[in-house]
Amino acid sequence: MAIAKEDILAAVEGMTVLELNELVKAFEEKFGVSAAAVAVAGPAGGGAAAAAEEKTEFTVVLTEAGSNKVAVIKAVRELTGLGLKEAKDVVDGAPKAVKEGVDKAAADEAKKKLEDAGAKVEVK
């Protein structure tokens, strides 16, 4: 019985980076191949290559406080650990970055928390 490509892809998708590294090494040993990348000339402009890379760091920007400023200030305090006055200054000074250099999950969580409080938020 042959294993379907989809089954293999599903199994690989569930692996950790360490497990994937071990799998690549096993392929190299079993089949006598190398996983070294072949040097290929990149695009002339370089812009397409940058766009193809997936972003790993995000900035959560508060664009507008909305009607419930008190709830937004509380959410900013929770997310940043700022004091009351500092959080109020961030909210009053919108658009302002609330979190910078965070991963996708943290950015989405912060965005949801701020939007639930009534703010308008962008993730860049």
UniProtKB/Swiss-Prot annotation:
CDD domains (alphabetical): Ribosomal_L7_L12
Residues annotated as signal peptide: none
Q: Does the keyword Transport apply?
A: no
Q: Which GO terms describe its molecular function?
A: mRNA binding; structural constituent of ribosome
UniProt keywords (A-Z) are: Ribonucleoprotein, Ribosomal protein
A GO biological process held by the record? translation
Record-level GO cellular component terms: cytosolic large ribosomal subunit
Q: What does this protein do?
A: Forms part of the ribosomal stalk which helps the ribosome interact with GTP-bound translation factors. Is thus essential for accurate translation.
What is said about its interaction partners and assembly?
Answer: Homodimer. Part of the ribosomal stalk of the 50S ribosomal subunit. Forms a multimeric L10(L12)X complex, where L10 forms an elongated spine to which 2 to 4 L12 dimers bind in a sequential fashion. Binds GTP-bound translation factors.
The record's comment on protein family reads: Belongs to the bacterial ribosomal protein bL12 family.
Protein name per UniProt: Large ribosomal subunit protein bL12
Q: Which organism is it from?
A: Burkholderia ambifaria (strain MC40-6)
Q: Organism classification, top ranks?
A: Bacteria, Pseudomonadati, Pseudomonadota, Betaproteobacteria, Burkholderiales
Q: Which gene encodes it?
A: rplL
